[in-house]
């Protein structure tokens, strides 16, 4: 049984600068809560070294993100996927249940050459414009950014007639302050979002489960099932 959905692909093809198709779970469109999870970026590396071949493959393969997630579902995945799943009480053997419910893609469209590298201002601005276009297609009810460094370049939305805000919480979890924000589109659509500590960096699934369960209990309840 297919656990991903390609019904939005024709619309994704019209999004400027969108390099990879987002992952859309087979149950996402009909879910009681549409949840979008954002990763940060792909890396053009072969082992620990930059790979031009991997870079070229990355930017030429629209199915790249979907392939990574499919591999994570089948083989157990990287820390990003494993600890994200554990945040919602999923063991690896139930990964397909989790990913069939949600949508996900990576924010920065150009593959990074170094794990510790920071995306340029231009890359961040392009990413926000892509994000705005993508969410108007798939209409999530909530978005959770995995990581806390996404707000750079958000002012690119000012020229798109999209109102936005972002703020820090006053609590600290895993040495990080989570963030909350919202995008408000001119057609009335509003997208609240959270930014949490990156799941691959000294991350405690139970602590973040408790935080999200306090903030958005109906979403966590749906994902926990």
Walk through the language-model features, giving the residues of each.
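A polyanion-binding, active-site-adjacent surface
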Residues: 2-138, 142, 148-152
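C-terminal capping/extension of enzyme domains
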Residues: 2-7, 12, 118-132, 152-225
